[in-house]
């Protein structure tokens, strides 16, 4: 069967299912494709097809993820679903599947469970901005009061992790009934109601080109008669010739003006998100800049040395450490294009961190790096990746 090309005439949003094991994340994903297939918005994918997720490697970490796409009348969605809990942890920390919003699946029969809590915490730490709740398996509850209790419990848990628990849409239903073609309230209509909530509650994300300009510096050259050129791939925003930028990180911040932009040796009047460019900068010598810094819109990003992060430590099988690490651990932190050494502070009651663990740490770098919340990084020892992390909060 030939793959249909989705026309990009609708806004695109990335979402995913999160929640405790066996609460019905994959069944819900299958049900969404089945119900939307009726209006031609999806190709139905049975549970087994989604559950047998292919393994991918993201920054040396093995992650199993299923990617499903579908559309509502308003939007085109890319949806990720992971078979195992560890896959979710890795996925969310590495940002392998960036989510603009998530559908939290909670079984009405069990209520919130440990992984429900952990996924909400991770969503908060890694910056999943919006959550919609699908209260699954409501056919297993006869008592409406019990359902209300579970709903209250879920709202309280969301509030605990600073999500607006009172405002978040909670849609009750049964993914299984929807898959069986049930047309009562908890069957197919519940799936359509869920998609309506996702459509309206999760905003369309800002496009990369609309964000403030940022380009990680990969290399710096001196071109005789022209001046100094910094090369790299524009991460976000647009840079026009004649605009002022700041050079941030590793050294005191400097201001300069981009006097030329070139791509494939052709001169352009601007560079935008996704372009590999050379930016000619005024008044700076080759030795004034280095790999690991960023060119950015003035005032949009600042250099920092202390931050809190959520990290996943690679297992031995993934090529990570074979032994635990302890407080005072000093690896390198690879941000964008360069390694910076830093020391690790563990949470109060934690003595050591084992390969395969996922943990919140505090880091102090020896030199400042341009950073902001949600920035991803790798933890390395002599060039070998031993972990992946995301900045959860900047300390100073």
Curated annotation (Swiss-Prot):
Domain tr-type G: 10-206
EC numbers: 3.6.5.3
Primary role: GTP hydrolase that promotes the GTP-dependent binding of aminoacyl-tRNA to the A-site of ribosomes during protein biosynthesis.
Annotated compartments: Cytoplasm
GO cellular component, one term: cytosol
Main localization, broad class: cytoplasm
Enzyme class: hydrolase
Residue ranges, annotated region (G5): 174-176
Positions annotated to bind GTP: 19-26, 81-85, 136-139
Stretches for region G1: 19-26
PROSITE patterns: G_TR_1, G_TR_2
Protein name, UniProt field: Elongation factor Tu 2
Assembly and binders: Monomer.
Residue ranges, annotated region (G3): 81-84
Region called G2, residue ranges: 60-64
Family: Belongs to the TRAFAC class translation factor GTPase superfamily. Classic translation factor GTPase family. EF-Tu/EF-1A subfamily.
Database matches in SUPFAM superfamilies: EF-Tu/eEF-1alpha/eIF2-gamma C-terminal domain, P-loop containing nucleoside triphosphate hydrolases, Translation proteins
Stretches for region G4: 136-139
Catalytic reactions of this protein: GTP + H2O = GDP + phosphate + H(+)
Keywords from the named record: Cytoplasm, Elongation factor, GTP-binding, Hydrolase, Magnesium, Metal-binding, Nucleotide-binding, Protein biosynthesis
Residue sites binding Mg(2+) per the record: 26
